[in-house]
From Swiss-Prot:
Mg(2+) binds at S230, T251. Signal peptide: none annotated. Its EC number is 3.6.-.-. This is tRNA modification GTPase MnmE. It is an enzyme of class 3 (hydrolase). Pfam families: MMR_HSR1 (PF01926), MnmE_helical (PF12631), TrmE_N (PF10396). The gene is mnmE. One of its GO terms (molecular function) is metal ion binding. GTP binds at residues 226-231, 245-251, 270-273.
Amino acid sequence: MNSSETTICALASGVCKGGIGVVRVSGPLCKVIAKKMLGFVPKPRYAHYGLFFDQENDEIDKGIALFFPKPHSFTGEDILEFQGHGGMSVMCCLLESVISMGAKPADPGEFSKRAFLNGKMNLVQAEAVADMINANSKRASKSAFRSLSGEFSNQVNALTKSIVELRVFVEATIDFSDEEIDFLQFEQVKLKAKGIKQAVETILKSATQGVILREGLNVVIAGKPNAGKSSLLNALTQESSAIVTDIAGTTRDVLKETICVNGMPLNIIDTAGLHDSDDKIEKEGIKRAHFEIERADVVLMVFDAQDDKPDFSILPKNIDDQPLLLIKNKVDLISGAVKKEMINNIVQLSISAKHSKGMELLRKELSDIAGLEDFSEGVVLSRKRHIIALEESLASIDNAIMQLENGVVELMAEDLRFAGQFMGSITGEFSSDDLLGEIFSSFCIGK
């Protein structure tokens, strides 16, 4: 059945006990349900206080009812809301009554999906609804609100328009190549294409920061057994997240904690000590450690200050492109000072995790790697799919410039078409049903 023909309902206030609970209904049966449960259809956008009735006309609760007629509602459909006492028993009775009158339980994100399909918001704004709910810092929530307000969408739409306009012009040169029309010269076309490329690169940089702001920077602590990795995790999180003993190999699995530095989430991941082992459990822990190291945004290579230097042979071989910080731990044992220095073009921090010395120095270094100092107030929360689309669009624009330089105008127009499609996929202008299903299935029910 088409979504516009069905009526959906959900507990919009979440599955928890509270002072107030909200049941949200959207679809063509809203007026019918209102007449049965209230005895009348509420005046649009006015709060009505009264009794709620079930299918048998028995009283369920007393509260506030709101009616938003289409198209002036969140979903673009008729919307009815019941705001009652937040006990789960009361809310379940309200939901059961609404369902008995023809509504069906909403799927995760179905309200937002209908809002998107009915043109009430684009895909970026729909995603921002979920990001507002899941934001884990003040900075993240502010950035999500900017996306919800259309800031990111407007940037993408402006670029998409520029790409389309350039493609239309290039195609016109193909269609009317034999006629005397005053077209821009070669260098002007190239200049415009490079201007678009530069604009995409700027948005890509901001979006990359937005992904970090949304998902956090994955920081993996690696090193030999008893190097002080777990002590470092505890010092960074300021909690006893990991067991610390003098026995080497205490940590055999992966431990994960999230902290915030200046509003930026950092996912700190402690791993098993890296060394040769015949122990089956230790070997599995080392295997998992290698997996985390290979997918890390930054690796903290921890080694004992009593050793001459870190042993890089214990690290996986294919991490050359990943940021690496050398952490010279236990400097208190050699009467060393907390400091930062460069060792073979790699930053090395001398610290004492046990005594929490040098933690501010480490937090500052992690902030720099994440680009925190470069974060402007204009950064919006982004997703990895946005990054992929921007990178694909950028590659297509590069190809278009190359085709122009080679004099193959037809292929330039085709590459510009691809660039526009990749950009359009961000806001949902060009999106498959599979993509929409994947995006909205991650939402909570009632949104």
